[in-house]
Amino acid sequence: MTILFISDLHLCPTRPEITTCFLDFMENEAVHAKELYVLGDLFEFWIGDDDNSSFSSLIKNAFTTLTNQGVHCFFIQGNRDFLLNKRFCKETGITLLADHTVIDVDGKKVLIMHGDTLCIDDVKYQEFRAKVHQPWLQWIFNRIPLFIRQHIVKNVQDKIKEKKQHKTLSIMDVTQSEVERVMHEEGVNLLIHGHTHRPDTHSFTVNDNQMTRIVLGDWYTQGSILTYKDNTFTLLNKSFK
């Protein structure tokens, strides 16, 4: 049994090399898996499930093809695609999961998430996140004409890039105490997440319990895939062709 985990692809029309790598992954690796988990930021930005552009259709078709072949696909919203919702999932056969979800992997409880909720030292981001996740605000935004939403998102992108330049690397990483709190709350000793773009496996001890946190990588310069096979988790890279 093979299970695959990916995140932080940031797919967009202006980075065709990432899209090509992703489509190759779907056709040659994902097709042989039992399950595929996408832990957020599949897209650079997702402005709504009514986006029927040729680019979004290309990505939708890749998932539809995969799910039609019997691969179970799951998605957790990231900070760039939190508007990806039920319509997209219905069209593609993907199952939308809660922000924090515990799954069963060969009898072992594993907590999966995007990871942005763990970065609690970034207070301004957490305040922004709380605002944009309000259902009433999303309801209003989704009813704004698509071309206006595109303009709004472009302005938000520019502001995010500007603010990031003034943030320290530490404030954009997870807060260890929050990691431990959430893992204890969910009753797990293994956590898998993305968001920070710092692929690694972290081991630590809490109250004599061995804990593990696996961080997925981004797809800016190569693909990053976490595989589970033969009772082992392995972080792999996939080169751009």
UniProtKB/Swiss-Prot annotation:
The source's superkingdom equals Bacteria
Catalytic activity reported: UDP-2-N,3-O-bis[(3R)-3-hydroxytetradecanoyl]-alpha-D-glucosamine + H2O = 2-N,3-O-bis[(3R)-3-hydroxytetradecanoyl]-alpha-D-glucosaminyl 1-phosphate + UMP + 2 H(+)
EC numbers, comma separated: 3.6.1.54
Instruction: Extract one GO molecular function annotation from the record.
Output: UDP-2,3-diacylglucosamine hydrolase activity
Q: Name one GO cellular component term.
A: extrinsic component of plasma membrane
Q: How many cofactor units bind, and how?
A: Binds 2 Mn(2+) ions per subunit in a binuclear metal center.
Residue sites binding Mn(2+) 1 per the record: D8, H10, D41, H197
Q: Which residues bind Mn(2+) 2?
A: D41, N79, H114, H195
GO BP terms, alphabetized: lipid A biosynthetic process
Under the heading InterPro entries, the entry gives: Calcineurin-like_PHP_ApaH, LpxH-like, Metallo-depent_PP-like, UDP-diacylglucosamine_Hdrlase
Q: What does this protein do?
A: Hydrolyzes the pyrophosphate bond of UDP-2,3-diacylglucosamine to yield 2,3-diacylglucosamine 1-phosphate (lipid X) and UMP by catalyzing the attack of water at the alpha-P atom. Involved in the biosynthesis of lipid A, a phosphorylated glycolipid that anchors the lipopolysaccharide to the outer membrane of the cell.
NCBIfam families in the record, alphabetically? lipid_A_lpxH (TIGR01854), PRK05340.1 (NF003743)
Q: What is the protein's name according to its record?
A: UDP-2,3-diacylglucosamine hydrolase
Gene source species: Aliivibrio salmonicida (strain LFI1238)
